[in-house]
């Protein structure tokens, strides 16, 4: 997979110190999800393991090491958790025993005679004891061993780990990046509705492109039509069916929070930066009928609802949505 253009600058910033032999052995990549951070981690790994890396800041693609990486069989690239049946999407934590098990492996010499990489795709899965055990290794690492860790915001890294690593904060693509990349993928960006979808949240850009744009287009239209009807009939519970759509749950929160933010912009007469340009009717209803305070509290309540869904295992999502819709109606009535 090619490196995404909006991550090229970050890639060069990370690789160049290593190219001149002044790089740090422990790197943390920190960002929100779905901007291509795992792709960046792979390209960093490819270069660190490349047998011809002294010739360029990019891996050569042809040496034996590069071929092993592309076939996912490199013996010196250690995916943290692969030996414990943990996948990247697993909800299980990684404990101190797993750290001790892989420690024995990395203290051996590199099988390809180059570097070794320990790749941890999500710091959040490490228990406190696992982190403490990992810290001991990072403080005195084996020769030619690099640690590449990913931290997804808003999760906060403990101070002791932060102080022992170089942290690179990564950001999503700009509008220009997105349009250019979509053109390269032969995706039509002329339709205003698609542009609204793509601009609504930069951190989920790649995630949206992985889905069918047509599917999201239909779901988004259905969502806003139901939202408009709910306001017109003054019955928020009508939204329950569209909210309870697990196929695009994250997008639903993006849409509803986005429309609330647009209505706040409208009240402040800054209409030029509105995202949902095709939904001005709903924006005007919110802006003309509700106060800034009620809209602000509405936005916060939906963020709180989203965090509960993401962070409370086994929560009854439908019941939570019923509670949230009734609470939202109460907010709009009380603070208006």
UniProtKB/Swiss-Prot annotation:
SUPFAM superfamilies: P-loop containing nucleoside triphosphate hydrolases, post-AAA+ oligomerization domain-like. One of its GO terms (cellular component) is DNA polymerase III complex. The keyword DNA repair does not apply. The keyword Nucleotidyltransferase applies. One of its GO terms (biological process) is DNA-templated DNA replication. It holds the Pfam family DNApol3-delta_C. It is an enzyme of class 2 (transferase). GO terms for molecular function: DNA binding; DNA-directed DNA polymerase activity. It catalyses: DNA(n) + a 2'-deoxyribonucleoside 5'-triphosphate = DNA(n+1) + diphosphate. InterPro entries: DNA_pol3_clamp-load_cplx_C, DNA_pol_III_delta_C, DNA_Rep/Repair_Clamp_Loader, P-loop_NTPase. Keywords: DNA replication, DNA-directed DNA polymerase, Nucleotidyltransferase, Transferase. Its EC number is 2.7.7.7. DNA polymerase III is a complex, multichain enzyme responsible for most of the replicative synthesis in bacteria. This DNA polymerase also exhibits 3' to 5' exonuclease activity. DNA polymerase III contains a core (composed of alpha, epsilon and theta chains) that associates with a tau subunit. This core dimerizes to form the POLIII' complex. PolIII' associates with the gamma complex (composed of gamma, delta, delta', psi and chi chains) and with the beta chain to form the complete DNA polymerase III complex. This is DNA polymerase III subunit delta'. It comes from Buchnera aphidicola subsp. Baizongia pistaciae (strain Bp).
């Amino acid at each position: 997979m090619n490196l995404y253009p909006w991550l090229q600058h970050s890639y060069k910033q990370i690789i160049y110190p290593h190219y001149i032999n002044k790089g740090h052995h422990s790197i943390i990549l920190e960002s929100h999800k779905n901007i291509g951070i795992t792709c960046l981690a792979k390209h960093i790994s490819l270069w660190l393991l490349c047998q011809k890396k002294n010739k360029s800041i990019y891996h050569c693609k042809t040496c034996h090491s590069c071929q092993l990486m592309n076939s996912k069989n490199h013996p010196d690239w250690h995916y943290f958790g692969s030996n414990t049946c943990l996948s990247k999407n697993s909800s299980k934590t990684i404990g101190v025993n797993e750290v001790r098990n892989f420690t024995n492996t990395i203290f051996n010499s590199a099988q390809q005679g180059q570097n070794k990489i320990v790749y941890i795709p999500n710091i959040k899965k490490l228990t406190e004891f696992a982190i403490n055990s990992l810290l001991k290794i990072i403080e005195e690492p084996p020769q030619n061993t690099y640690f590449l860790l990913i931290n997804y915001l808003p999760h906060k890294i403990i101070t002791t780990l932060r102080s022992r690593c170089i942290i690179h904060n990564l950001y999503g693509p700009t509008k220009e990046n997105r349009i250019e990349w979509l053109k390269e993928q032969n995706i039509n960006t002329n339709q205003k509705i698609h542009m609204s979808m793509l601009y609504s949240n930069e951190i989920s850009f790649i995630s949206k492109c992985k889905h069918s744009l047509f599917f999201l287009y239909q779901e988004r239209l259905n969502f806003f039509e139901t939202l408009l009807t709910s306001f017109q009939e003054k019955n928020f519970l009508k939204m329950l069916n569209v909210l309870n759509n697990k196929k695009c749950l994250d997008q639903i929160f993006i849409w509803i929070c986005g429309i609330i933010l647009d209505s706040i912009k409208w009240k402040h007469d800054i209409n030029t930066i509105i995202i949902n340009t095709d939904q001005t009717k709903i924006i005007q209803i919110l802006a003309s009928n509700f106060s800034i305070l009620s809209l602000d509290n509405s936005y916060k309540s939906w963020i709180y609802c989203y965090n509960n869904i993401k962070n409370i295992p086994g929560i009854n999502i439908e019941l939570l949505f019923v509670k949230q819709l009734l609470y939202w109606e109460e907010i709009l009535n009380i603070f208006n």
